[in-house]
């Protein structure tokens, strides 16, 4: 059992209030997931730089800043608790190579031109306060509260999962064919950091989006993803909700003017 939430703003006048609204939604889902929490915020930023969301819990900010500056040219580096948002023109292939060689204890939790992801073990109320979610602005956001069932309670095991540029996924449910699907995706070049079935679903969607649009990808998912689930998958343009055909996991969708 987990809690998933998402909000998309029609009016730019409300963008400064996005974090406050998403905070309330996450806290209200606390009883469905007390083990960990996380959220993804999409911002309407017109820049050519990539933004990399990194968890640096095993290294001090000053040490990381000094060492990473020797490896790549940084546009900006902003600290938020044990996460940082790194802005640079360097492409994901370069960043992944640098992290794998020089910073093996630093975790890349998401990247893109718009998305910022923060997630951590702990009570959702504490996670919201830790990252000061109330102060975030943006166009849309999704969040997750986790009750662990099939994998460890770790930051890497927390949602959202991001396996593609400006893409992320949160999930309530369980997949029964994630091990077979994981093996197929690894053969196609996907890399996974946890044993969580949700990360496999995120990898499936990212892999499928190479050849299909989001709507067709999700339709294919109904055939390829076996289990009971409700997903929210986020992109730079918005997000979509997918439920299995039996639909035993609840989802409430509302729209206002």
At which residue positions do the language-model features occur?
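Conserved short alpha-helical segments that host acidic/polar catalytic motifs at enzyme active sites
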Residues: 1-257
């Amino acid at each position: 059992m987990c809690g998933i939430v998402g909000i998309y703003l029609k009016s730019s006048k409300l963008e400064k209030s996005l974090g406050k609204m998403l905070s309330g939604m996450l806290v209200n889902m606390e009883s469905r997931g007390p083990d960990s929490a996380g959220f993804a915020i999409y911002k309407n930023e017109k820049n050519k730089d990539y933004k990399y969301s990194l968890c640096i819990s095993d290294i001090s900010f000053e040490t990381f800043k000094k060492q990473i500056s020797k490896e790549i040219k940084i546009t900006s580096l902003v600290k938020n608790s044990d996460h940082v948002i790194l802005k640079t023109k360097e492409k994901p292939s370069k960043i992944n190579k640098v992290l794998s060689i020089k910073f093996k204890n630093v975790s890349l939790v998401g990247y893109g031109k718009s998305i910022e992801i923060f997630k951590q073990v702990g009570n959702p109320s504490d996670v919201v306060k830790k990252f000061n979610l109330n102060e975030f602005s943006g166009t849309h956001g999704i969040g997750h509260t986790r009750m662990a069932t099939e994998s460890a309670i770790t930051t890497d095991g927390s949602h959202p999962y991001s396996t593609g540029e400006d893409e992320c996924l949160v999930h309530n449910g369980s997949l029964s064919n994630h091990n077979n699907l994981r093996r197929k995706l690894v053969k196609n070049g996907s890399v996974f950091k946890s044993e969580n079935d949700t990360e496999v679903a995120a990898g499936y969607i990212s892999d499928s989006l190479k050849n299909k649009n989001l709507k067709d990808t999700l339709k294919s998912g109904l055939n390829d993803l076996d289990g009971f689930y409700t997903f929210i998958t986020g992109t730079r343009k918005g997000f979509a909700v997918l439920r299995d055909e039996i639909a035993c996991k609840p989802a409430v969708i509302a729209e206002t003017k």
